[in-house]
Amino acid sequence: MTARDTATLDFYAAEAQAYAGRSREAEHARIAAFAAALPPGARVLELGCGGGHDSVALLDSGLDLVATDGSPELAEQASRRLGRPVGVLLFEDIDATEAFDGVWANACLLHVPRAALPGILARIHRALKQGGLFYASFKAGTAEGRDRFGRYFNYPSPDWLRSAYGPEDWQSLDLREEIGGGYDGEPTPWLHVTAIKGTAVKGVAVKRP
């Protein structure tokens, strides 16, 4: 099954400049913790970089960043912000093997159709080195659907998301639930997942603070 949604990509193509240009704070605290858990100069793949807001903070943390987005239009906007090339990469085209110390996927895998998400997580798992760190965030819910802009969201529950990660071997997986915002400006429940690639645990349980 394809991991892309045409209507969602069409939205980002049409709104790329406005989306990238909006006032948005990078996830500084999470990025700092992410970078601190990696070796100096760690090679990190960023998925769904959008306008490049997090990319700036990741680069400032001293990481060897490979920033990408599935939307050519957003990749161009991010490239302008960063002053360096940003790759166009659809999730279903991730084909690296043990190439990255970390993967940063903030607010992007939430657009992957539910049926396709376990396969995409498997691709990310394969792209990570042993002991590699993987961060992703999702808008929480109980059933997949679309927002008022027509964008698709998988809206997982914590238990559903755990099952999506479960088929792969993760040394640890930490899931935290928080209220945050979004492009529509509305308060939104979010799931923040940090996982470490390893073979010690299979079908790991979700940890809660």
What is each residue range found by the language model?
Residues P118-Q130:
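A short glycine-rich, Lys/Arg-flanked "PGG" loop and its adjoining helix->strand segment in the class I
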Residues E144-W160:
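Acceptor-substrate binding/catalytic loop of class I
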Residues G182-P209:
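Core SAM-dependent methyltransferase catalytic element
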Residues M1-G50:
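Conserved class I S-adenosyl-L-methionine
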Residues E92-V103:
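A short acidic, Gly/Pro-enriched loop at the edge of an enzyme's catalytic core
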Residues G51-D93:
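Class I SAM-dependent methyltransferase SAM/SAH-binding core
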